[in-house]
């Protein structure tokens, strides 16, 4: 399976951000791949969002240990209204309308700056 195929089909990525004191924060999270960027939808008050607001650099990895896909990314918050393509991608992949979710209320775009594997 190609990297592009996996970016479209795999259910989760591992997202690594850095806490202000320098410790890593690593979490699995649903994502979509749209226009050469990862998009996640999460809670505005989450640790990952606080970390990314302080330091917009992050790494992401697909789960497979035998065919690793790892990217270093620069993040940015995407305010509502969310891009139609992103909304449609979450709906198609997870049957989830991110526009109507009150808990998961922020979208983060992660633009790969460098692919380390994959």
Task: Give the positions of each predicted feature.
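A generic local structural motif
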Residues: 1-2, 26-27, 45-47, 94-95
């Amino acid at each position: 399976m190609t990297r592009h195929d996996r970016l479209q089909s795999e259910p989760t990525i591992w997202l690594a951000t850095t806490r202000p004191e320098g410790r890593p924060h690593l979490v699995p999270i649903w994502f979509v791949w749209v226009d050469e960027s990862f998009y996640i939808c999460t809670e505005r008050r989450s640790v990952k969002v606080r970390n990314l607001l302080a330091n917009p650099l992050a790494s992401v990895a697909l789960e497979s240990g035998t065919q690793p896909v790892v990217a270093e990314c620069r993040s940015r918050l995407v305010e509502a209204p969310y891009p139609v393509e992103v909304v449609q991608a979450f709906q198609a992949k997870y049957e989830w309308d991110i526009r109507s979710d009150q808990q998961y209320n922020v979208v983060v775009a992660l633009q790969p700056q460098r692919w380390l594997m994959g």
